[in-house]
Amino acid sequence: MKKPKKSFLFEKLGVSYTISAVIMTVTAITLTLVAASYAYQILEQQRGATEFDVAMESILAFNDALENIAWKHQASRSSRFTIEYGQLDLVPDRSLIVNVTGGPNASYSLSREFSTGYIVYSTRIKYTNFGEGYQSYFLGSKSTITSGAGSYGRASITQKLGEVYITLSYGVRAMKTSTFNVTQGNETVPVNSVDIWIIRISIPDSLRGTNIGDFDLKTKCLNLTTIPDCGPPGGNGYDLEGDKQCNITVQLEEDTSPPAVIQLDADKVVFNFVVATVQVSV
């Protein structure tokens, strides 16, 4: 009468061992899957972070290409981009306004508006995170105008609303380039010439929008235009009235920086807006 009870006990132990083995196997599989998933996420984050660093280098290379051809009519170049974890957008039709004023006694104040575009790479903060509100420049500076040598390009990193952006735009350069004489009545009057150089980015309608994958970002100088402003009728320039300087400010979308102050040494001044229209396309 006791033997069946012993057999039943062994059977219960056998079932218990089987259940334990199944539980251990399922647990091991689950842990393996979790570890694999975590490892994959880490790998994806590393790849996304690497792409961001490469995108910065590609933006710098593209800027070099663009500035190299900007003042050479019909010249063109390209730079290679590979984007999987973010996206590159070509943003057209943004306002660039140049304002020129003299000193308190000067007789001139002029403004010119141009349309331009810029290039934006964006990715999520899961791949790279600088902190909400972060902004810094790795090419140029926040200033929208310079009166000396240096890059026209302005490349910044900005983080907002869970995204990190690399933005490439182009500022303005201005300086006194020459002095010449004009005859006014019986007098010879010295006139300063101030050149204002502008790189205007043109983006074709068909290419506006988002780009992902492998592609060449191309740039081509479409034309060079000089727009002279020689002052009132007669074309001899604006009278300085003793104020030997001009102040030039540039508003590029929401960005406006303090004026570039150009020192002058003549009695009059003329301005030349020298515009390079550069097409950017994929």
Question: What residues fall within each predicted segment?
Answer:
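N-terminal leader/signal peptides at the extreme start of proteins
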Residues: 1-13
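N-terminal signal-anchor/signal peptide hydrophobic helix marking the start
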Residues: 15-27
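Aliphatic-rich helix starts adjacent to a transmembrane/signal segment
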Residues: 26, 30-59
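N-terminal alpha-helical signal peptides/signal-anchor transmembrane segments
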Residues: 58-73
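Short, glycine/small-hydrophobic-rich surface segments
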Residues: 71-89
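N-terminal beta-strand/beta-hairpin edge segment
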Residues: 86, 94-104
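Intrinsically disordered, low-complexity regions enriched in Pro/Ser/Thr/Gly and acidic residues
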Residues: 103-268, 279-282
